[in-house]
């Protein structure tokens, strides 16, 4: 995902001399499903063809060893170079420019372009919603695929319906502060209302690598952290607006009054001090792995979901298919990370049982709920319960009713789920007759959706 902007840049710079072909050699079994690949192509607006290399035939033929790997082939069909890892835009740009110049002078470059496939129609209000939060009758949704946020009015007594109350953002990718109507986001994910103040919220604007503050009274968006430039890692305290963040994916307010942020791109958890307006590291060595221990030595792998019990922070560590626990200290050295469920980067599955035996697959959301952890087990399309007292994992939903759920939040008794690939918010109720799962129907309310103005 992090290299897609680089590829888009190169495709735009060399429109008639560069053809990009994506080869998807899936790590997770869910990612090897062609339907899920099509949804990912749609979600990230990928405009080049993508091959499902499920059996790793192309991967092995090119001798790839890491994700992502780039192979550069010249107009005569020769492999002229390979490199792997993120942050390779400049290297690739220089190599492509050199090849274009050489083959144009030799007359061996055929200038042509391939029109991208048409984007599929999506008539629903939401497009790949990533995260949600609840404050009273207010529900805030990251409408990630539309690069905006949606505010709903919802009553859990009638969980099957909600009303559209407001829209935050123009619905076009960008990085602009200002009024709700003028602001622009880029693939926003984690969102939280301020504790005790439903008129303010924090947004992890993932694609812009920044943190934003929403004021629902003034209807304004303000950047409070990050520069808008993708960074590498945070190892020292830094003024919030000078911090270079790397894909902030979720946020949570903790009992110490601080905002904790999961940086999926740098495999870290950091802390935002709203009083000092400072960002500081808490846990994560910036090496992608599953290693427990002190915060400065522990290794995380794309932490993507956060929840707090007031004392500790639990997080979904997506690339290790694990749920882990953070004891935050004043410094990374004083913090501690331990793993509850999960074994490593290449250990995943779909299995209930003890913490030791259970397997998840790329979970993105967690919720602390009455001494139990609820997990959006994204690639298994399930909601699971982890009980720290019994150290057991239990599936609460079957695997054929949700489509890559990415978050779960609770009102009083009812739960809301960001059913990402279903382009919807689902509700979940535990009743004496068994669990009830349904879809929230979003009615126009006080606002109309400008992206679907003809609807309703």
Residue locations for each model-derived region?
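Residue-level detector of Asp-centered blade-edge/turn motifs that repeat once per structural unit
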Residues: 134-136, 193-198, 253-256, 308-311, ...
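Thiol-/selenol-based redox modules, centered on thioredoxin-like
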Residues: 74-131
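Gly/Pro-rich loop segments of beta-rich domains
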Residues: 109-130, 156-189, 220-249, 278-302, ...
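Structural microenvironment flanking redox-active thiols in thiol-disulfide oxidoreductases
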Residues: 2-43, 54-58
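Beta-strand-rich domains and repeat architectures in extracellular enzymes and scaffolds
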Residues: 120-150
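Conserved beta-strand positions in repeat-built beta-propeller and related beta-rich domains
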Residues: 141-147, 195, 201-207, 261-265, ...
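A short loop-to-beta-strand structural motif that recurs across blades of beta-propeller domains
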Residues: 71, 147-150, 209-212, 267-271, ...
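Short, internal strand/loop/helix patches
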Residues: 37-67, 71-73
